[in-house]
Curated annotation (Swiss-Prot):
Location(s), subcellular: Cytoplasm, Cytosol
Pfam families hit by this protein: KYNU_C (PF22580)
Keywords of this entry: Acetylation, Cytoplasm, Hydrolase, Pyridine nucleotide biosynthesis, Pyridoxal phosphate
Name of the featured protein: Kynureninase
PTM annotation (N-acetylmethionine): residues: M1
Metabolic or biological pathway: Amino-acid degradation; L-kynurenine degradation; L-alanine and anthranilate from L-kynurenine: step 1/1; Cofactor biosynthesis; NAD(+) biosynthesis; quinolinate from L-kynurenine: step 2/3
Domain of life of the native organism: Eukaryota
Assigned EC number: 3.7.1.3
pH dependence text: Optimum pH is about 9.0 with L-kynurenine as substrate, and about 8.5 with DL-3-hydroxykynurenine as substrate.
Family stated for the protein in its record: Belongs to the kynureninase family.
Known cofactor(s): pyridoxal 5'-phosphate
Amino acid sequence: MEPSPLELPVDAVRRIATELNCDPTDERVALRLDEEDKLKRFKDCFYIPKMRDLPSIDLSLVNEDDNAIYFLGNSLGLQPKMVKTYLEEELDKWAKIGAYGHEVGKRPWIIGDESIVSLMKDIVGAHEKEIALMNALTVNLHLLLLSFFKPTPKRHKILLEAKAFPSDHYAIESQIQLHGLDVEKSMRMIKPREGEETLRMEDILEVIEKEGDSIAVVLFSGLHFYTGQLFNIPAITQAGHAKGCFVGFDLAHAVGNVELHLHDWDVDFACWCSYKYLNSGAGGLAGAFIHEKHAHTIKPALVGWFGHELSTRFNMDNKLQLIPGVNGFRISNPPILLVCSLHASLEIFQQATMTALRRKSILLTGYLEYLLKHYHGGNDTENKRPVVNIITPSRAEERGCQLTLTFSISKKGVFKELEKRGVVCDKREPEGIRVAPVPLYNSFHDVYKFIRLLTAILDSTERN
């Protein structure tokens, strides 16, 4: 699931420290890492929030003209600067030529989604005809489950991780109820072992092996929203197929974050949103994938006009010519204004490439982990200082850019103090603070400054 072997983050930090004749925690290491960063120019493609504009900022603690430390791309990505330009292009076209905009221009409205789908294929590792840009994530999940979840008396379960994102949980629960099944019997959730935060792959594979004959669909998140755990998508897919199950994934926290190869991994179906790592703005246009092997066998349960072949769509004879594959699942006219914001971001990804972004991300988050463990690891019974625990897996192949932190003191106070100092992250129940340095627009110096602020907050808490 990873690019070719590369220098481990801790080794890179120590190498640079040796070259500079300084401690690995020195600020000069962060600055050198930024100098060596081949992707640093892409930060200029985004608007970075200023300290003065943040609602929870304490201006007595910061320089109001400084950029915020924005570590929340796992919730909402920053705005690409070209979004306004692309929106204005379509608004101007609408104003000047009205309905002619459906057929002319850079993004003809009738094929607005299709005009940018080629930019998505390398991000998810799929053929163009396997991808549709439409709707919102949970809408797409419902549409996909209506076609892939066909329970029988013997094979009636959907397998998912416990504490999946609520929207996934509700969607699966309601799909089971739609078929008149008992949720308690047909919704199979895998929990971490007692005392552990994340799932072990061997436990997932064991459940699939033992219960697979009764499982209709295996449906996991690609990367867990709370723990930050990246699941082994090809291994889960292979195990599910060996037992005759369809295998699908919610890639909300994986797309644009880690490398994906949905076609080569033989995933049956997947869906994702675009407002996190894909930076399309709140409620942005979502995506869906169906493997080409299902193009002529899996049909949409609900059909609309935009699932009809374009070549005969305007014959108006009400004789459906369904587009094979996932594009037959499209129901309505693509929302061109949402297409614009996604277009602006996908062009940046095309220039940066997922392989290069992932390589930087491994180093960036590894540097964050190194500093956290250096300053705030250990056992609070030994040193009586507040301790930061990282519940996200330490191995790069088992996580994306996000680290989920828990504290030996109340997270609410820590979070409030971070906000006052211009750190944009979030807290998630029950105990986590999520921080996600994004390689497109975050720097190693951002990480260094975050650690300085966190350390000052925890030191102050200790003194008080």
